[in-house]
Structures are given as C-alpha cells and as structure tokens.
Amino acid sequence: MELWDLFDENRRFLYKQHNRQEPLAPGHYHVVVVVCVVNSKEEILVTLRHPAKETYANCWENTGGSVLAGETSRQGAVRELKEETGIGVSEEELMLLGSVRGISAFYDFYVVRKDVELSDIVLQENETADARWVTLEQFIQMGEDGTLAEPVYRRFRQFEEAFWKLIKNEGEERKHENL
C-alpha cells in the first residue's frame, strides 16, 4: 500500500497520510516530482511508459512520480529516478526549477546533469519500456504530436524558460572552470 503525506492548498503539511488507492478529498494535495535528466550534449532523457499503464500508455515522459509518506521532495526524486531508470544521483545534484500546484498535487520540477549511456539504464518492470536521448527540438515536437504525455509536456512548457536559463548558465560556469 502506497501512502502519501497530505498538504493544504498552501502546501502546509496536514499531519495526515493518504492511501493512493483512495480518492483525495477536496483541498488535499500530495507531492509529485518530475526529474529531467540532461546530458552534456544538452539532450533530454525520456522514457516510454509501459503499454500496460492505465494512463498515457506508450507515451514518452520524464521520470517522475509521487513522493511517499515521510519522504522529502528531493528524496522522492532520487528514489523515482533510481527505480525507473537505475540512475543514481544525490539530493545535492538535483536543481529545483520550480513548483506548481495542480488539481490534486504539487509538482516539483527538477533538473539533473548526468551523462549516462542508454545501455546502462535499467528500466522498471511494468513502468518503463524504453529510454532515449532527444534534443529540445525533438522533445517539443513529441509534445506537439502527442507522443510525449500531455501533462509532461504542459509542465515542461511552464518551466521551459527557467530550464534553459539554468542549462545555459551552468554551461557558462563550466567554461570558466576550464580556464
């Protein structure tokens, strides 16, 4: 049984837990994390949702999922990335782009810079069926043509400007480190 911590509309902890199988009461929210892995070529890692998934089966997405009861957002992001791809990162490597409140959840959008070979990715059974690196242009085209899960694309577009500022600024810092 998967349990979530519950929050109010201002993200104040309600000191209650919720069983994922039950509908959320109005005014109650849980936390969902999205992790966008970006390599040194500025490509974005996407994974294919398993064909047996109830929603958005066979659609591409960024890694993500619900934060479990007792976890912080960063701990949930580290866990989800490891479970769905086998990629290990530390909480300190995660860069929070922002958070947005949805209908029943707060979505925390993280970026992590990591060079990973596709052959090293370990897909989670019944969750992910494939993985690939795509350029930003390909990612946006996937969103436009519906092969990228719609909520993933919508949330990415909300944070797109911050995403590119972060990537470009980090790249500039790395150039100066090499001088």
Q: Can you say where each PLM-predicted feature lies in the sequence?
A:
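Acidic, metal-coordinating catalytic segment for phosphate/diphosphate chemistry
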Residues: 1-34, 38-40
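Nudix hydrolase/Nudix homology domain
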Residues: 57, 96, 101-107, 111-179
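A glycine-rich, hydrophobic loop/mini-helix early in the fold
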Residues: 32-64
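Short loop segments at secondary-structure junctions
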Residues: 10, 39-42, 50, 113-118, ...
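A short, polar/proline- and glycine-enriched secondary-structure boundary/capping micro-motif
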Residues: 25-27, 55-61, 132
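The catalytic Nudix box helix
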Residues: 45-46, 62-95
